[in-house]
Amino acid sequence: MVVARTLFSISATLIIFLALFLHVNAVQETREPKHESSRNTSTVDNLSDGEWHEHAVKDPEEIAAMVDMSIRNSTYRRKLGFFSSCSTGNPIDDCWRCDKKWHRRRKRLADCAIGFGRNAVGGRDGRYYIVTDPSDHDPVTPKPGTLRYAVIQDEPLWIVFKRDMVITLSQELIMNSFKTIDGRGVNVHIAGGACLTVQYVTNIIIHGINIHDCKRTGNAMVRSSESHYGWRTMADGDGISIFGSSHIWIDHNSLSSCADGLIDAIMGSTAITISNNYLTHHNEAILLGHTDSYTRDKMMQVTIAYNHFGEGLIQRMPRCRHGYFHVVNNDYTHWEMYAIGGSANPTINSQGNRFLAPGNRFAKEVTKRVGAGKGEWNNWNWRSQGDLMLNGAYFTSSGAGASANYARASSLAAKSSSLVGMLTSSSGALKCRIGTLC
């Protein structure tokens, strides 16, 4: 009897072990890879119209649930008194800013993204590269120690700066894949020349930079990687130009006064989060989508969260075409023409924002449909949920009201618009100092 019980126990143990082994292998075999190839190629040219982009988010409701959990955890920690001196309820900031040793754990930032660009790892898995030289004399053979030398490298890099500096670029700064530009701890300005181009690449993080007074440049040779340089025609003079790229996160930058747009994302770009930025003194702030006829932008998914649209802005906060756009918990304190516009049937999901209309009684409307009559745009899915309208502001909704129509334009759980002031209180490039809370 004892022998029989012993054999039974051993058999049961082996069965449990085998079941666990098979389960682990199944998980490993079905789990999607965390990283993609850093090969600098375009996926846009290989897509047929209407084909879903490989980097677009196929289950945004899952993302919303994940981000909702992070927000709830952030709120729960505040209620318990954790990080009470710095926590704001902003899930991105609460993820890293309460750490006094943030400068020793810079790459933790890559785990704090939310929304459609949440998988942008930047240079997390690479070395640190310290920019020591603000010059930019040769866009084809850049000098080691310069920002241009760093961004063209083929390997992943987390790029930081040795000291405060103003970088005036001679030609557009064309970034290679898997790069983070991290301006925390110093005061870095990219100003008075060309600015940033994110073209046919993936996994880019741009954080903590002052970008302003960008000029049109071009008709010159410019290097885009260690092995390639080529002729560039005239660039528009955008602050950040995103072209045919995916997994992009633009966070805590201050942008103003550029020749064209402050941030443009076009030509099949997707999986983008624009968060915690401070935008001022500009006409056409953010363009999302190339042209009405470029239907490959139907795959575009962009999250715009916790930004402050401030003094001197006129329009395009953002201006959307074709794709899916989640505009959530932003603070709109200034516009002269309109705040959110679009054409070519974009889906716009506006949630928990604060809109303060200008004094001009003809500019109170938040929204603007471009190039279409009411008979056409009345079918476009644009909705406002929980937005706070001040000084006569109003949002003209259209399309179906059912939540299912906004699934692909949902990327995180909105907080109450009454909290927007707190959520956006630190928008723009932060004045972090090493050894203290940021």
Curated annotation (Swiss-Prot):
SMART domains: Amb_all. Its cofactor is Ca(2+). Pfam families: Pectate_lyase_4. It catalyses: Eliminative cleavage of (1->4)-alpha-D-galacturonan to give oligosaccharides with 4-deoxy-alpha-D-galact-4-enuronosyl groups at their non-reducing ends. Residues 1-26 form the signal peptide. Pathway: Glycan metabolism; pectin degradation; 2-dehydro-3-deoxy-D-gluconate from pectin: step 2/5. Its EC number is 4.2.2.2. Ca(2+) binds at residues 236, 260, 264. Glycans are attached at residues 40, 46, 73. GO terms for molecular function: metal ion binding; pectate lyase activity. Coiled coil: none annotated. Keywords: Calcium, Glycoprotein, Lyase, Metal-binding, Signal. Transmembrane segments: none annotated. It comes from the Eukaryota. Binds 1 Ca(2+) ion. Required for its activity. The active site is at 316. GO terms for biological process: pectin catabolic process. Belongs to the polysaccharide lyase 1 family. This is Putative pectate lyase 14. It comes from Arabidopsis thaliana.
